[in-house]
Swiss-Prot record:
It comes from Escherichia coli (strain K12). This is Protein FlmC. Induction: Part of the flmC-flmA operon; the antisense antitoxin RNA flmB of this system overlaps the ribosome-binding site and first 3 codons of this gene on the opposite strand. Component of a type I toxin-antitoxin (TA) system. Either this protein or sequences upstream of it are required for translation of downstream flmA; this could be translationally coupled to flmA. It comes from the Bacteria. Keywords: Plasmid, Toxin-antitoxin system. It holds the Pfam family DUF5431. The gene is flmC. The keyword Disulfide bond does not apply. NCBIfam families: PRK13720.1 (NF010277). Disruption phenotype: A plasmid unable to express the start codon of this protein can be lost without detriment to the bacteria, when normally the plasmid is not lost due to the Flm plasmid maintenance system.
Length: 70
């Protein structure tokens, strides 16, 4: 069988394999799992994403209006 290839923005040495991944440092990445078609969102500051609705109203939305991560 063919080995399944993972497209990712991680550094090549972090994955343990060689590939065509970019080494650009990004603060926010969105990765889609090809098997289950789910989205995994990686944020540099998770405190912004997990605030409750009262904190968002007081502190501002931070550009994540309507985004729910569970």
């Amino acid at each position: 069988m063919l080995r399944q290839h993972q497209d990712s923005l991680l550094l090549r040495f972090a994955q343990g394999e060689e590939g065509h991944e970019t080494t650009t440092q990004l603060s926010c990445l969105v990765c889609v799992d090809r098997v289950s078609h789910t989205v995994d969102i990686h944020l540099s500051d998770t405190k912004i994403a997990v605030r409750d609705s009262l904190q968002r109203r007081i502190q501002g939305g931070g550009g994540f209006h309507g985004l729910r991560i569970r």
